[in-house]
Amino acid sequence: MNILVFGKDGQLGKAFHVLVDALLPTLVNAPNIQYVGRSECDLTDAIALNNLLNQFQPKLIINASAYTAVDQAETESDLAFAINARVPEIMAQYAVKYGATLLHYSTDYVFDGEKYGFYLEDDLRNPLGVYGKSKAAGEQAIAKAFSKGSREGQYAIFRTSWVYGDGRNFIRTILRLAKESEDLQIIHDQFGVPTSTEWLAQVSLDFVMDAQGVLRRFPSGIYHAVPAGETNWHGLASFAVQTALEFGASLKIAHDAIKPIPAVEYPLPAPRPMNSKMSTDKLHRIFEGRCDMSKLDLLNQPWDKAVRSYVHNLAKDGLI
């Protein structure tokens, strides 16, 4: 089986690389995997992307690529839509035509954040900024491509939020600032769930493949994929700083000295949803139907467990 993983240079793509490299020796029939980054294919070149798909002929496409510069997207809408909408559309068209499986990633930014409680997969999209609009367009393009039917093709769109991993992210930024300053002010009235790329990659592979590396069948559609619990940006920052101090990091600020502020006091070019909490009941039902309790344990893992492990590894590697 051929597998194409797009976005190899991003946080999620790197997590897939590490996970799959560890998994391959355990498989009897190991798949042929190619990781694709900017040096392998310019995703804005539709001809080049189609040529790559047709030449490699993947049975599984994992699209971990994305334009994620939320504020910059406000002035680069063409590029944001090219990568976040047109690229998944081309991948979906290939999957429909050749009976492949497409695993694509989307975001909480497709919602306006005005709902009370947890968003469901079929709640109305109402993105506030260009980034969210481009990701919503990608979701719709995939669904439209598959709406005509495909004998073997299937797709899953994993909506996730507040992603962090090997690369630039909120947690690493906060820890860097905590080394430089005794004064930190962090937004306290935007809520969501921090999601580790390591966690997300593992859940993704468990969803699409069995223990032998054979592709699973599943109902095509959107699935929310985040760990258990919820927090706000101030809560995440405080927990990250507290954890770093526990592991011996030299910081200039204590976790309880971080000042909470409302979002209106920290204006940004692109608006953010105030509520990014998403229900994962639909994803849970898939794993419950497979009677795989170990996978359910991973789904039920609280967000702070992975954050603690992440910060510990940063401290151990001297990156704080």
Q: Residue ranges of each PLM-predicted region?
A:
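N-terminal Rossmann NAD(P)H-binding glycine-rich loop of SDR-like oxidoreductase domains
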Residues: 1-22
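Adenosine-cofactor binding site in Rossmann-like domains, unifying the SAM/SAH pocket
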Residues: 24, 29-51
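NAD(P)H-binding glycine-rich loop region in Rossmannoid oxidoreductase-like domains
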Residues: 43-83
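NAD(P)-cofactor binding segment of oxidoreductase domains
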Residues: 54, 75-103
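Catalytic helix-loop patch of NAD(P)-dependent Rossmann-fold dehydrogenases
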Residues: 82, 86-90, 110-158, 162-163
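NAD(P)-dependent short-chain dehydrogenase/reductase
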Residues: 143-206
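Mid/C-terminal beta-alpha module of Rossmann-like enzyme folds, strongest
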Residues: 203, 210-268, 314-320
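Amphipathic terminal alpha-helices
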Residues: 295-320
